[in-house]
Structures are given as structure tokens and as C-alpha cells.
Amino acid sequence: MNLDKLQQWLQDSNNDIAYISNPITISYFTGYSMDPHERIFALLVFKDANPFIFCPALNVEEAKNSEWNGDVFGYLDSEDPWELIADNVRKRTSDTHTWAIEKDDLSVAHYQYLRGEFPNASFTNDVSSFIERLRLYKTPEEIKKLQGAGAEADFAFKIGFDAIRTGVTERSIAGQIDYQLKIQKGVMHESFETIVQAGKNAANPHLGPTMNTVQPNELVLFDLGTMHDGYASDSSRTVAYGTPSDKQREIYEVDREAQQAAIEAAKPGITAEELDSVARDIITKAGYGEYFIHRLGHGIGKNVHEYPSIVQGNDLVLEEGMCFSIEPGIYIPGFAGVRIEDCGVVTKDGFKTFTHTDKDLKIIPIRD
């Protein structure tokens, strides 16, 4: 179990306690997910004692009925959560110990509260890099959930393509996608805001859907994903509404060639930066290198963006079980944008994608 690995890390690194404060990380180790809003939600793991979840009293029964089979302690809004955390820690270990914290997540205020309860403790060690490395390799169970999320993304593309017509807004198309995911697939949460971009808007990669309307002979870019049993999907497709121009076709085919070459190259032994270069070199040789303005890909898992980063300067050697996106893009301001994206997993036989929506340039007939 992953929790056993964390406890072993505590022993090997001479840490006594890990204070896990990121809700996604807590879910990774316990199977229990919640949004604490402004309240305290933490997992405390000890090198030589039983771990416990600490959460609002509102969520105690939910946590006890989840996959988690360990202790759960709660607090009322009228109580001091830090005193209660301290009481439960002291029942398990002494006052003088070394804590490992998630430095990228723990707020300064919460850190100060912990220091106030444990003035003789050390909080200098960071557990984040160990967790990042642990989450880098997906289990077969995790991959199955990622595949499920990918299937939902494929469904979403179909809904989006069918919704395109002259005069419809980007927001309307995005809304139809989100609605149909809920009523037909039972999706409760998208992994990020559904992006639909028509025409020149697609040259702004992270611009959300606007009230801009789709017009004939434009490219329409979709970037979307869902949360499936706690795991994310993230995929992009670009389609032509009406007759694409020669230049629209050209940038699409260059981007598609770059993505396919990277997918074929994503095998054990290649480094992250080498994989980025496979796609980037194709786009650059075609004359569009200045318009590929982001990394080739990012990790995928319980977060829609996580380690590893498929980017120049990252010499990480890719191995079996690593999951990430491959998403080259070409964005020409004032004209159009193209991005084709699939997430997948590195296997001994190559890169297996979680999404399967066709990548030939789809031409949607003009319709009112």
C-alpha cells in the first residue's frame, strides 16, 4: 500500500510524523476525498504508530464510511482544531519529534499554529518530492480509472461537435457538453473548465469559453476533461466548421504530425526533454516554431496537471507506468489555433492513449 511506503520513508529519512495537508494527497493515501473549504483537513502519518484523519465533525461519518479503515477524529466549529490535533498526536508519540510537511501546500498560518502547539519540534523536512515520485508511477487500478475518464472525454467531444452551428456561442457549446456529461454519464465534476474556442480565440490557449459566436469556415478548438472515480482526463481536439483554408489545413496537419511522432517516440528510455524535442522540431522545421508556446505535456492522475513535465530541460528518463499528456499546439494570433492532445501511459510496447477520438481533420458542415 502507498501508506506503507510513506511510513517506510519516514523511517528511512529519520522523520517521525508526516503532516499531509493537500486534499488530493490525502485522497491518494486514504481513498477519502472532500473539499474542506476554510476548515482543517489533514492526514497524520507516524513512523511507528497508527495514522489518523483529522477533519470537521460534519465529515466524520462520511470519512469512516469511505475506503479509509483507520482512525478519524473531528472537531466542532466552536473548538480549536490545533489543540485537538496536538492531543491526538501526543497520545501516539512524544513532544519532541521531526515533522515532514508538504511545503508546496501548507500555509504559513497553519505552519505557525503547528509550531505553537509543538515548539520543540522540527518542521524543516519536505515530504512533497517523495510523494511526487510515488505518484509518478500509476498502478493498474489507477490506469483503469484514467481510461474511464478518457472514455468520458471521448463522449464529450461527440456532444461538442454535434453542438456546433452558425451563431452558437462558445459558452453554449461548453454548457451543452457539461450538461450531457452529467445527465448521460453521471459526471459530477469536470477536471477543469471546459474550453471551446472558435476562430482567432483559439490562438489564446487558456482563454475560457466566451460569448464569441461560431462562424463558417473557422477552426474550433476543444479542451476538456472529467473526474472519474477521483482521476482526471484532459484531451484536446480541433475541428473545421465549413471549408478550411489551405493555411488552416497546413497548421492542422503539422500539429497532427508532431503529435503522432511524439506518441510513437514515447517509450521507456527516452527523456522528457527528448520527447518534447520530437514534436517541437517538426513544428519548427515547418516554420511554426515560434507559435508553439508551451511544453509538450504534463503528468495526469488525481490532478489534471501533475509530475512529470514533458519540457525542455527535464532529463527525467520515462519509464513504464508514467502517465502524461502529449499536446503540441500552434497558435497564430489574429488567425487561429490548433491543439491535439491525448493523455496516456508508457508501456513496454509504447504509449497507450486514454482517448480515442479520431484525429483526421474533422469537417463539420455549415448548419444554422
UniProtKB/Swiss-Prot annotation:
Positions bound to Mn(2+) 2: 223, 234, 341
Q: Where does Mn(2+) 1 bind?
A: 234, 298, 327, 341
Enzyme class comes to: hydrolase
Tell me which cofactor or cofactors this protein depends on: Mn(2+)
For this record, the Gene Ontology CC terms, alphabetical, are:
cytoplasm
- The answer to whether the entry has keyword Metal-binding is yes
Q: What is its main location?
A: cytoplasm
Among InterPro entries, the record links this protein to:
Creatin/AminoP/Spt16_N, Creatinase/aminopeptidase-like, Creatinase_N, Pept_M24, Peptidase_M24B, Peptidase_M24B_aminopep-P_CS
Q: Where in the cell is it found?
A: Cytoplasm
Q: Which domain of life is it from?
A: Bacteria
As one GO molecular function, the record gives: metal ion binding
Q: Name one GO biological process term.
A: proteolysis
Catalytic activity, EC? 3.4.13.9
Report keywords, A-Z.
Answer: Cytoplasm, Dipeptidase, Hydrolase, Manganese, Metal-binding, Metalloprotease, Protease
Give the catalytic activity. Xaa-L-Pro dipeptide + H2O = an L-alpha-amino acid + L-proline
Reply yes or no: does the keyword Cytoplasm apply: yes
Cofactor binding notes: Binds 2 manganese ions per subunit.
Q: Which PANTHER family match?
A: AMINOPEPTIDASE, DIPEPTIDASE YKVY-RELATED
In the record, the note on similarity to other proteins reads: Belongs to the peptidase M24B family.
What is this protein's name? Xaa-Pro dipeptidase
Q: What organism is recorded for this protein?
A: Lactobacillus helveticus
